[in-house]
C-alpha cells in the first residue's frame, strides 16, 4: 500500500483520488488517500498531487502553513509529485506573477491562463511520451509553458507549446487528467515512471 497526499485547498480532489486508485489497481497496489490542508501530513506521504484551482490562493496557503517546504523536501528525497493546471504554475521555477510563490520543483517558466485568453476550455488528443495511445486532455483556462530548462523533459506539446513536462520524479501538466476516466497520466507519474522511488514504498496485495 502507498499513501497518496492530495493538496485539498481547491480543485478536483475526489476525481484525482479516484484516478490514483485506478492507476494503483492496475499494478495491484492499494492506495490510501490523505487530504493535505496543514503541515505535518506531507512527510508521511509516498506520492503527492497538486491539483488545479486558483494558483495564488493555493500558493498562499502552502506558504502560510509551511507545506511548501515539506513538498520541496519530498521532491529532494526523490519521491513522486504530479502537478496539474494550477499545480503546474505553483510547481514551476517561475510563474511570471509576483502573487504566486512558486515551489521551484520543476525547471519551467509558465504563463498563467494563457489558453483562457482565447477559449475557456477544450479537449484535444495528445501524444504523450510513455503512453502508447493519445491521451484525451481537457484544458480549462490552462497555463502555457513558455520555457523548459535543461532539467525538464517535454512529454507532450499542443500547437508547439509544451503542456506536459517531467523533471526527475516530478510530472506536471497544463491540462486536467482527472476529468477523464483515463488514468494513464497518474499511472505515468506514480507507478510506471522508473525515475521515481515509489517502488520502494509499496507492497502488492
Curated annotation (Swiss-Prot):
A single MF term (Gene Ontology): glutaminase activity
InterPro entries: Class_I_gatase-like (IPR029062), PdxT/SNO (IPR002161), PdxT/SNO_CS (IPR021196)
PROSITE patterns noted in UniProt: PDXT_SNO_1 (PS01236), PDXT_SNO_2 (PS51130)
Pathway: Cofactor biosynthesis; pyridoxal 5'-phosphate biosynthesis
Residues that hold L-glutamine according to the record: 53-55, 112, 140-141
Annotated catalysed reactions: aldehydo-D-ribose 5-phosphate + D-glyceraldehyde 3-phosphate + L-glutamine = pyridoxal 5'-phosphate + L-glutamate + phosphate + 3 H2O + H(+); L-glutamine + H2O = L-glutamate + NH4(+)
Entry keyword set: Glutamine amidotransferase, Hydrolase, Lyase, Pyridoxal phosphate
A GO BP annotation: pyridoxal phosphate biosynthetic process
Entry annotated with the keyword Lyase: yes
One Pfam entry name: SNO
Hydrolase among keywords: yes
Active site: 85, 176, 178
Assembly and oligomerization: In the presence of PdxS, forms a dodecamer of heterodimers. Only shows activity in the heterodimer.
Protein role: Catalyzes the hydrolysis of glutamine to glutamate and ammonia as part of the biosynthesis of pyridoxal 5'-phosphate. The resulting ammonia molecule is channeled to the active site of PdxS.
HAMAP family: PdxT
Protein name per UniProt: Pyridoxal 5'-phosphate synthase subunit PdxT
Amino acid at each position: 500500500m502507498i499513501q497518496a497526499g492530495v493538496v485539498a485547498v481547491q480543485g478536483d480532489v475526489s476525481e484525482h483520488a479516484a484516478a490514483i486508485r485506478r492507476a494503483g489497481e492496475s499494478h495491484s497496489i492499494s492506495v490510501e488517500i490523505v487530504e493535505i490542508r496543514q503541515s505535518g501530513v506531507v512527510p508521511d506521504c509516498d506520492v503527492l498531487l497538486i491539483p488545479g484551482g486558483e494558483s495564488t490562493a493555493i500558493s498562499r496557503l502552502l506558504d502560510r502553513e509551511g507545506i511548501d517546504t515539506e513538498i520541496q523536501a519530498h521532491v529532494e528525497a526523490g519521491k513522486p509529485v504530479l502537478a496539474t493546471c494550477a499545480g503546474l504554475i505553483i510547481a514551476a521555477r517561475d510563474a511570471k506573477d509576483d502573487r504566486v510563490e512558486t515551489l521551484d520543483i520543476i525547471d519551467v517558466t509558465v504563463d498563467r491562463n494563457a489558453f483562457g485568453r482565447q477559449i475557456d476550455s477544450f479537449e484535444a488528443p495528445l501524444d504523450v511520451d510513455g503512453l502508447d495511445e493519445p491521451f484525451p486532455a481537457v484544458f480549462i483556462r490552462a497555463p502555457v509553458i513558455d520555457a523548459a530548462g535543461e532539467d525538464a523533459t517535454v512529454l507532450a506539446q499542443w500547437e508547439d507549446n509544451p503542456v506536459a513536462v517531467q523533471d526527475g520524479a516530478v510530472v506536471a501538466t497544463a491540462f486536467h487528467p482527472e476529468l477523464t476516466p483515463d488514468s494513464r497520466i497518474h499511472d505515468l507519474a506514480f507507478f510506471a515512471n522508473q525515475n521515481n522511488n515509489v517502488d520502494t514504498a509499496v507492497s502488492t496485495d
